[in-house]
């Protein structure tokens, strides 16, 4: 039996391909903020983007619960010595037909502009260690294996030093503007936020989340090997 054809569809191609001709196995290539601002897609993707901002901030009533990862502030509330470090928001949109929320928007931090004053390398288990563990499981009669995906672990990791990020005002959905009263916070075409917890793209986010995980597991008798990082 032959495998189904797979189409890679980006925002520009989507209107040219009849929906009935696209197989279930279709993969939708991510599109960026510029394409999201296109009037053709703004309504659908604006709603998705609103959910993502609400998830990162203090929520959107009736839609998503916030994680208090970031907080919108006025430009004047940003410390003078941190304004040079203010980075950009990278916005990525993707279609995930297998998910309950098909149109998915994610915001990551422009980490290349972050000045981290400490070594933010994260201890990581190497591939050989993982292979040894898996081989041990499959070689042991009646052994069972379990993996756990921790939701919002990055977003729940407090940072000692806050970071700052900006959003172009023309991409912010109207309901977000109203909910967070952003009209009064516009400065030179941007709104600004204070990042209080870990976010994808922050160079220190992985280390902070790993340290928090080690602390939580330590309360139940688990500890990290001194010879094998991440184990």
Task: Cite the ranges covered by each PLM segment.
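Chromodomain-type histone methyl-lysine reader module
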Residues: 1-231
